[in-house]
A protein has these predicted regions:
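Short, basic alpha-helical nucleic acid-contact segments in DNA-binding proteins
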Residues: 122-127, 288
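Active-site glycine/GP-rich loop and adjacent strand/helix microenvironment
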Residues: 1-52, 59-66, 74-81, 166-501
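Short coil/turn connectors at secondary-structure junctions
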Residues: 104, 140-142, 241-242, 268
């Protein structure tokens, strides 16, 4: 306890800097904007868009909005060793990002500046904000289990790597952090996920672990293997000082009850982080508020596209100051990793503006709008939570898609759900979920009216490990890979249904 209180004092000045967000948000973002533009002015990209003469945000709007395919050619040249393309100098690290939404991998540049002023800054701030929220913390009395992916050489260029962002972070981590981190770097960077889980379980059982960091679905696999090996019922029997899980990558709602059952300690906390291959953007600053604080003084300049504009060839794009509370936006970023006005694919919804706090509401491509219902991932998560509460169920994984018209000319949503605990009544679960979605989403309610457009949703129970096997078939176990929750077409769900035998 003493060590945590002493070390915690080192975070006080940073906590005060973060407090400035509430009153100085626009000024902070203006400073970031100018820094990024000035630093990149002499790059090939900066010359193309005449960054040297950009003075205002209005000037900056001449830079076109980018998606990955728009910058892929530049990134490919950078991966072959070319310098001063999107960011000064040579970028040698590339975060491989695909999720499961696209078979083509994306290789996101991760510059030294980006590592320092975005990714590692986010990790440090997570601890700073956690210690403020939990002054009784014993965080530094033990070690942190950080679950990451793997990396491999990039075109055999010296010291150049491509892989999961988490692996790049572990590879380049401050050596001092290795004294308070498990597992070893060798184990953490293993490419075979199932072997990694086994080795982590073997080597961490006798450690004093106080904190966990990783993607909830993959961390769950580690926890379950540790419990299997030890015969323990609860993780706090093995790690009695465990107190916080820093989680990100997927929504935690479907996993919360499982974690509560596996970690029964009343001192256990869960803190959401918004870290992606493209950057680190948000942190839960209050453990009692699910919304995250938008991190304003990293090397990230934010813009937003109203979701209804996302398919417009020339969408309306607004700065942070113009966002409205409760509205869905696609996030657009410019960063010191060389991403410029880049659409990252996530949608966010602000809950307040002083300071700016938000929730991740879904993905620009992960929603169902086949019939005008605009069902977002956050709608789905809330609906499932209600259905689980009403029927005693626990959902492990799920994916949903529209049925456009079956033999009886009926349209509906089809949900493929893997339960860790079955509902006491599947029919009641189905009714409750459908009713909850109508309560949450007025567009879905309108389309469900008298079953005219949409019939009541359908649930198919997935066999155990279906989603694990689907990801494995695609070579996407571990790291930051995830199951697509909602899709506007049937491509993914048809693949999954073929495996559901």
């Amino acid at each position: 306890m003493v060590s945590t209180k002493l070390i915690g004092k080192l975070f006080v000045s940073r906590q005060k800097e973060i407090d400035r967000y509430a009153k100085e948000a626009e000024a902070i973002q203006e400073h970031v904007f100018r820094k990024l533009i000035q630093t990149a002015a002499a790059t090939e990209w900066g010359k193309k868009y005449n960054y040297a003469n950009i003075r205002t945000y209005t000037d900056f709007q001449r830079v076109h909005i980018q998606q990955y395919d728009d910058v892929k050619g530049y990134v490919d040249r950078m991966r072959h060793g070319e310098k001063n393309i999107l960011w000064p100098g040579q970028v040698v690290w590339y975060a491989k990002s695909s999720g499961t939404t696209n078979d083509k991998s994306k290789f996101i540049p991760v510059s030294k500046d980006g590592l320092r002023h975005i990714h590692y800054k986010g990790g440090t701030d997570a601890v700073a904000l956690y210690l403020r929220s939990n002054p009784q913390s014993n965080f530094f009395s033990g070690k942190g289990l950080i679950l990451g992916g793997s990396h491999s050489p990039n075109y055999n260029l010296k010291d150049s790597l491509v892989g999961d962002l988490s692996a790049i972070l572990i590879q380049n981590i401050n050596p001092l952090v290795n004294f308070i981190r498990v597992p070893s770097k060798e184990i953490a960077l293993l490419s075979e996920f199932e072997e990694k889980v086994e080795r982590i379980a073997e080597t961490t059982i006798h450690e004093n672990v106080t904190n966990l960091s990783g993607v909830p679905s993959w961390m769950l696999a580690v926890i379950k293997r540790i419990l299997e090996k030890t015969g323990a019922k609860h993780l706090n029997e093995i790690w009695p000082n465990l107190e916080v899980f820093f989680h990100g990558g997927v929504c935690f709602t479907p996993y919360r009850e499982q974690y509560k059952q596996l970690i029964t300690s009343d001192k256990m906390h869960y803190m959401e982080t918004y870290n992606a291959s493209e950057g680190f953007f948000g942190l839960q600053s209050d453990l009692n508020d699910p919304a995250m604080l938008l991190m304003l003084d990293y090397d990230v300049f934010y813009e937003f596209i109203p979701l209804e504009e996302i398919d417009n060839p020339a969408p309306a794009i607004i700065p942070l100051a113009d966002v409205e509370i409760g509205k869905n936006y696609a996030m657009v970023i410019s960063t010191s990793c060389g991403l410029w006005r880049y659409i990252i694919g996530d949608t966010v919804k602000f809950t307040q503006k002083s300071p700016y706090k938000f929730v991740i509401s879904g993905r620009t491509k992960h929603f169902i709008n086949a019939f005008g219902e605009e069902l977002m991932v956050d709608n789905a998560e809330k609906g499932l939570a209600r259905a689980c509460a009403a029927t005693g169920a626990q959902v492990l994984e799920y994916s949903a898609a529209p049925v456009f018209m079956d033999a009886n000319a009926k349209c509906r949503h089809q949900w493929l759900i893997e339960f860790s605990t079955m509902p006491d009544s599947l029919e009641n679960f189905r009714h409750t979920l459908d009713k909850a979605l109508q309560d949450i989403n007025s567009d879905y309610e309108a389309k469900r009216h008298k079953d005219i457009t949409l019939q009541e949703l359908e649930i198919i129970v997935a066999r155990p490990n279906l989603f694990h096997d689907w990801l494995k078939q695609k070579g996407k176990l571990g790291g930051q890979h995830k199951v697509p929750r909602l899709s506007n077409n049937r491509d993914y769900i048809e693949e999954m249904l073929k495996l559901n035998i």
